[in-house]
Amino acid sequence: MGGASVNIQLLDGKPCIRKSGASPVECHFYQRAALHLSGLNTPALLKVEGETLFLEQIPHPVTLTQLHRNEQTFAQLASLHNANYQPDFAVKTHGWSLADTDEALAILCLPEAANEQIRHIQQLGYELFEQSCLISGDSNEGNWGIRDNGELVLFDWERFGYGSPAIDLAPLVPQMGSLAEYEAIIERYLRHSSLLSGDRLLRHLVMAKCWLIIEVTNLLTRREKPQAQQYLEWYRQQLPR
């Protein structure tokens, strides 16, 4: 959902990902942060030309089901969240304002009962951004891939910043998720991290799932993305009434 342009091209006779218009956060991540984050697989940086990154191509996509079954999904996210590394560059600042909420709700046109529920959660949402752990900020299934050797890799780092681990777990919950699905994700994650209790993670996961609706709605409509209407219709069908 970012503003960069991505394509495959040859570099020294081998296919790579050329990402032009990469954000400063993502450029700095690959140049300065990635090497310090042990236990986390990210694409190798092959070359940099200004705001254009040439990255290792990760050839095999993964499904959400595959991510759930792969212990490395949760182990790698936990490694990131527990990292002692402190970036020496400006990272993405995440937040959830009432203005952003009202903007998204005006677009979504949900029943007033749903609007009130979302506004109530927004008032508590500051908890998501009080955490001092590093997060991807965009760990949806489309940003994972598998190398030929079977290694799981997480890419697309323009939202690299600080926040609750639940922000990275929320995209792993199918659709809007049931309580059992939330608890299953938390159980897998807690095998690798004790940063937050299960109860705290569940609370944050509900908040993060709601926050992502606001974030995605506003990003897609502000950037006039062609898939915006598809997402909006899906949200209207899925959100409680």
Q: Which residue ranges define each predicted feature?
A:
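A glycine-centered beta->alpha junction motif in the catalytic cores
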Residues: G50-Q66, T101-E103, C210-P226
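Glycine-rich, phosphate-binding/catalytic loops in enzymes
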Residues: E71, V153, A170-V173
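Conserved kinase catalytic-core helix
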Residues: P61-W96, P111-R119, G125-E127
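A conserved alpha-helical element in kinase catalytic cores
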Residues: G3, G13-F54, P61-N82
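Short Pro/Gly-enriched beta-strand edge/turn motifs at strand-loop
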Residues: E26-F29, L37-G39, Q117-F129
